[in-house]
Structures are given as C-alpha cells and as structure tokens.
Amino acid sequence: MIPPAGSTPPGEALIPSVAPQDFWRSPISGYSGSVTRHISHRANNFKRHPKRRKYIRPSPPPPPNTPCPIELVDFEDLHPQRSFWELLFNGCILFGIEFSYAMETAYVTPVLLQMGLPDQLYSLVWFISPILGFLLQPLLGAWSDRCTSRFGRRRPFILVLAIGALLGLSLLLNGRDIGMALADTATNHKWGILLTVCGVVLMDFSADSADNPSHAYMMDVCGPVDQDRGLNIHALMAGLGGGFGYVVGGIHWDKTSFGRALGGQLRVIYIFTAITLSVTTVFTLVSIPERPLRPLGEKRTAMKSPSLPLPPSPPVLLEEGAGDTLPSTTATSLYASFSSPISPPSPLTPKYGSFISRDSSLTGINEFASSFGTSNIDSVLIDCFTAGHDNYLALPSSVPRQAISVSFPRAPDGFYCQERGLERREGPLTLGLDGDVLRVGSLDTSKPRASGILKRPQTLALPDVAGGNGPETSRRRNVTFSQQVANILLNGVKYESELTGSSEQSEQPLSLRRLCSTIYNMPRPVRNLCVNHFLGWLSFEGMLLFYTDFMGEVVFQGDPKAPHASEAYQKYNSGVTMGCWGMCIYAFSAAFYSAILEKLEECLSVRTLYFIAYLLFGLGTGLATLSRNLYVVLSLCTHYGILFSTLCTLPYSLLCDYYQSKKFAGSSADGTRRGMGVDISLLSCQYFLAQILVSLVLGPLTSAVGSANGVMYFASLVSFLGCLYSSLCVTYEIPSADAADEERQPLLLNV
C-alpha cells in the first residue's frame, strides 16, 4: 500500500530534524522525532507523581575513522612474536659463557694444586670474584635499566662482560706459561699462581655477570608469550654449552698430533673456548634489535585527543504538565559522572577505523587499544572534558550557565599531557570555559593507578530543574552512542602513561642510597625467592667447583701433589678427565630437561618442579659418597642437570609473573616502582653469595674430613633444606588486586 503524499515516512518520523546545536535548547513541545513511553507505577518505586514521558531517540550512524599520524604512534610496549631462530640466537651467549665456565670449573683447581697452592687456600680462589659480583651486580643491573646508548640498554653490557671473560680466560689457561716467561722456576710458580688467580677472578665475575643482561635483554624484546620460551631456550643453550665444554676438556689432547702441535692440553682448550665465546657473543648481539632508552630529560612525542565533537545528548525528561518552555533566568547545573559498563571487547564498542595505512601518514590504532592499558585513557578523558572547543560540553548562550564542578581521581605523580594537558598541582585546577569556571578537583583514592575509563560504567546524569529554587533530582539515563564514540576516540589515541613515559621522566638519577633503599624495601615474594635461590646455588656450587677433585681423589684414589711420574699423580689426572665426562653428562641432562620443562609446566605446578629438582639433587650427591663404582657415580650426574636447569629457569619465570601484578611493580608516584634489571640482579646475587660461603666453608671442611667427601655431604644437606623452603615459603602466585573497589569508584563525581 502506497502512503499518501502528505504523510511522513516512518523512517523520517523516527529521526529528529533538529540541528545538533538545538539539542541543549530549552525543550519545547515540538520534538517531533521522539517516541513517547509511559513509566509504570512499579518502575517508579510506587511513588505518586504526574505521569512522565520518556523520549527515545535512535542512535546515529557509526562514526568515521579516527585517524592519527603513524609516526606518533608509540609501539614500544608492543612486541611481535619472536621466531625460534631469533630466540635461539638470542641465547647463544649462554652457550659461550657456559662453555668457558666448564673449562674454568674443570681445570682451575687441578692447575692451582699442581702449581703448589696449599689445600687450605685453594678454595679461597673462588672468594674474590663472588664478593665483587655481590657488590657490583645490583649496580650493573640498575645501570643497564637506565643506559641510554644507541645500541640499547643491555647489549653494551653483554659486549663488555664477554670481553672481560675472554681476557680472564686468557690469563687462566696461560698463566703458568706467562709466569715461566717472567720469573718463575720449576719449583716456584708465584707469578703463575698470581696471574691464574687474577684470571679466575675476572673470568668468573664476567661470566656470571653476563647472565643478567642477557636475561633482561630477552625479556625486554619479547612479549609475555615468548618470555617462557626464551628462558627455556636460554637454559637449553647453557646446558649444551657446558656439555660441549666438558667434552672438549675430557679429551686427552696431549696424546693427539693436533694437541702436540698447538702446545698441549691447556693451549687447545684455550683456542676452542676463545673462538666459541667470540662467535656466540656476536650471534647474540645481532639477534634481535633493541630499542634505545630515551634520555632522562627527553619527552616522547605524545598525541592530542582528536577534536571530533561527540553527538549531543537527547533532551531532558520533563514531568507531564510542566510548562512547555523554561524561563531564561532559570539556573542550569550540569552534573557528570560515569557508571555504565564499557570494555574494549564489548559488543557496544565496534572497531570503527581499524585500518592501518602505510601509504599515507594516517592510521587508526584501535586494534592496539587493548594493549595500551587503561591508565593511558584517563589523561585523554580529562583532556576531552576540559578542552574549550569541545562542542558536546557547550551550552547555548540563551541559557545562563553556572560553575561546573567536576572531581577527578587524583592523577599519579609525574602525570602530564603535553602542550595542553594537565599539570601537577597541589590544589584543584580551575579552567575557563567561555567565561565560566570549570573546577577540576582531586579525589583521594586508594588505587590511583586503577582509574581507567574502560573499567568503569558510564552514565550521564542530567537533573531536571522545575524552577530556580526547586528540588533537583538525579535521575540517570544511558547514553549508548556517546559511550561508544568516547570509547573509540579514547582508545584510538595513546597518551603518556604511568607505566611508560611519565614514570620514566619522573625517576630520580641513580644513586647508591636509592639502590640500597630498593634492596632494603625488597618485597616479601622476592626476598623468599632469593633465599630459595641462594640455597639452590649453595648446594650446586659446592658440588660443581670440586667435582673433578672429588673424582680424582675419592673415586680414583689419586694425589694431585704426588710427583708427576708417580702412579698416584696419573690416577688423579685420569679422575679429573673422567670428572669432565661426568660434568658432560650433567650438562646434557640439563639441556634435555630444559627442552621438556615447558611441557612439564603444563602438567605439574612450579612448586612440584622445584621440590623434585632439590630432592633429586640431594639424593644424587648423597649416594655419590656411598658408592665407589664409576658407573653409578656417573649416572647420578643426570640429577645435577635437573637442578641446574631449574635454577636457570623457574626463578626468573616467577619474577616475570610477579611483574604482571600492578601492586608488585609499584609506581613512581609513591616511589615504590621497581626495575626488572635490579630484581634480576638481586636474584643473581644469590649465586655470588653462595659462592662466597662455599669458598669460606668447604676448604676447612675438606681438611677436617680428610677428603672431598665433605663437599658432597654439604651439598646434599643444603639441597634437602631447599626442598623444605621451596615447599613452605616461596610465593608462587600473587593475588590480583581487588577489583570491587575499582568498580565502585566512579570516574567523575558530583561536587
């Protein structure tokens, strides 16, 4: 049926024909596009009142794309998924370091004992480097967090420490020859001992310190998905490096023509180790590009919120029977608060403008809104609601306006919006709006970082005013389209946030006092994790540093101080070589366990994996002292690799999990923000602390027991202690902050 010519089509009857600037005009009876609906008695809480009409206006069409220049988009927090080869090359430095460390642990003690170092002093060789590491490791971690080199934050430290390890290795394996060239004799090797000890200190400190920037380097350039894979690959490369290192050290190069041509066993080992360390360092440095850190005083380019006006709101609900017009002298007050749910994945928020145009300088970045976090949105919201040219807050000149008082949550310290944003102030901020006053106050909130717009509901409350002194009601209605547009606009722009730019700018320069304060105020989860890490390294280092000596003296019944032509001396050398093969078994078992550890984490909890590693190591070291069978002792080396892989992987994985908690990470606003480089260094310092204790205790313990059996007893006892501590004291999950307070706290409050 064709409608008559004079009738209005149904589609046009639903769409208002009033200009956008007339929506804030005093409502009159001619709002032809509205649909009338009566509110029931029950819906009004059974109150007596004149009948009211509710006007419903359909939402306008979807908004256009919200473009922004791509050069202003900050992709620093967005890490692409790394391939296996990128992670493999990134972990090559661990292969070279462990290859070098295998040579050090296998030959330092035999070389020093053969040069005449007393039994009571040979364990003190390991005392100097861990003290330096314990004192300097946190400083290196803090400096790497703040390094502004154009090569990145971590790679300069990796390069310097790799060079230091190479120099130490040169002194370690060639110290005896250099001493003979200086002033040593066949019976007096004082210069050789001194140079060898200096090489041990430099090599040990550099090799152990290189682990921390390499781990931090991987965590900086990888997202959370790739961090666990990267840690497992690091442990795998470390195990393979140690395994091949012990294989090279276990071969009798003196009996080969290649070894005789190069000058002997130690010379061949030095050449292999130097080449391996140099090549793997280069592979790591070129593996993944690292973004340089901005200098402290430099502000990153931030984008302003787009000046696209939001559509005006529908007219205010009026009681039936009220006048058709409002007197021009009636005071109008606007109260705004947000309380209706909006979230990025909500169907209320269609992804308009989700295109990326590399051809021009404009692109929409709504696809990345979910990764920017909610703390980036608040500054945009404040800027949108305080800008003088925003049309959706403008009132027509026909209606006199009064002061609009809006209270925002307190902005974190260091918060700023460039060029036209808010600055930090002690009191409320007052802005002019065409002669009016907009007072922006501050609200004391217990969680200032949790003030994101996407976590709060939104409504717009417009009070009905019947007269100048009449009572005001605070009925609220949902403005769905405005919510959608606000969400799109605010998600389409990335501002400075507390976790990125503003916090970096507000940080104070590094000082020893501030570093000591960070260590002193260490959170309890990190403190317990460090103690557990210390127990693990204490037991492991006691076995590792003296295992070849244990094989030569206890299993093979040799004597390192016997004459070189004696049978006891030859037995000791055979035991040292066989100890290298035992360490090779341990290293390859560590590599294999690292390869399957990711699958085991899907089946077993981290607590269970910790317990199993400590338990097997305690059983392995304890049983090794009870048996003299070579095959039994070598088979027990597989247990040692499980603990090594665990110590190289699980503590750092737990630390990454800790940093997923906002409460743990802290903020620069209250001075509680922590750097991951510092915490990684604090965790790695437990290795140095364990090595200090081992060097002080195991020498006298070995002399008291009369053999190297005391070392294995000590390692077994400490490992069982670690079993109990990892089960009872370590924090494996930090509970998330209570979101209820966050939802109850509105973003904008009436004043």
Swiss-Prot record:
The keyword Phosphoprotein applies. Its main location: membrane. GO terms for cellular component: membrane. It is found in: Membrane. GO terms for molecular function: D-glucose:proton symporter activity; galactose:proton symporter activity; sucrose:proton symporter activity. The modification Phosphothreonine is found at T500. Optimum pH is 6.5. One of its GO terms (biological process) is D-glucose transmembrane transport. Keywords: Membrane, Phosphoprotein, Sugar transport, Symport, Transmembrane, Transmembrane helix, Transport. InterPro entries: MFS, MFS_trans_sf. It is a multi-pass membrane protein. PANTHER family: PROTON-ASSOCIATED SUGAR TRANSPORTER A, SUGAR TRANSPORTER. Belongs to the glycoside-pentoside-hexuronide (GPH) cation symporter transporter (TC 2.A.2) family. Proton-associated glucose transporter in the brain. This is Proton-associated sugar transporter A. It comes from Rattus norvegicus (Rat). The gene is Slc45a1.
